[in-house]
Every structure is written in structure tokens, then in C-alpha cells.
């Protein structure tokens, strides 16, 4: 977050201060801080004012509860049995939750894709 524009850094710090991580979501699972990092990196890229091709992205968290709901999908269980145990299944349900819950004003699908490719270790390669 070191190289973010000042306005984005202030918004990131404001949100990060008010939205704590969930204790049950430890590495390798994705937490609030991981998603916020990815979101603000994308926000910085897609609102770059030095470029001729500026995209007008609405920056900000719409609902911390919706983001928590999407993140909580990773640890869903019933009767002591976790619903998702395979890393691909966990990544898929997280992707679905981030896309469908619309926790951010804009950039939900981009954030979901970045999170899943980065943290699953499956980077796309040009071939």
C-alpha cells in the first residue's frame, strides 16, 4: 500500500481500521486485509490519472457485512464437517461470494479474479 495515491491510501486506512480480520480465517484462507489489498491495488490501477484512458471506478466498500459473508463461505461447516476441503473448491466458493455479494461499489469481479489467481498459486501464463 506504500505506492497508493494519497486519496486511495486514506480510504484504505479508514476501511482497514473499521473492518477487522476474522479470527477463523488464517493463512492460507483469505481474510479482509487480503481482499482490501487486492481491491485497492486494482482501484489504483483502474483510476490512474496519468493515463489517457481513465476508467471511472467508484472506489469504496459498500458493505463490510457482505464482504464478511463472502469470506465466510471458505469455512462453512455443518455438524463439524467442513463443506469445502479442497483448495480449488474453497477458491471457487470465495470467487462466487465476492462476485455475487457486491461488497464494493465497483470492481467486485476484478477483485475476485485477482484474489483467486494470486492466492491459489495458479497464475495465468502467456503461451
Language-model regions: role of each:
Residues 1-127:
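FIC/Doc superfamily catalytic core
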Amino acid at each position: 500500500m506504500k505506492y497508493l495515491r494519497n486519496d486511495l491510501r486514506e480510504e484504505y486506512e479508514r476501511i482497514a481500521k473499521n473492518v477487522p480480520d476474522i479470527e477463523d480465517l488464517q493463512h492460507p484462507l483469505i481474510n479482509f486485509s487480503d481482499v482490501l489489498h487486492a481491491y485497492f491495488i486494482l482501484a489504483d490501477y483502474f483510476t490512474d490519472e496519468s493515463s489517457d484512458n481513465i476508467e471511472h471506478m467508484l472506489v469504496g466498500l459498500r458493505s463490510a457485512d457482505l464482504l464478511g459473508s463472502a469470506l465466510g463461505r471458505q469455512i462453512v461447516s455443518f455438524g463439524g464437517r467442513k463443506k469445502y476441503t479442497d483448495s480449488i473448491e474453497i477458491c471457487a466458493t470465495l470467487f462466487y461470494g465476492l462476485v455475487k455479494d457486491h461488497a464494493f461499489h465497483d470492481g467486485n469481479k476484478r477483485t475476485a479474479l485477482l484474489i483467486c489467481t494470486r492466492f491459489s498459486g495458479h497464475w495465468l501464463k502467456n503461451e
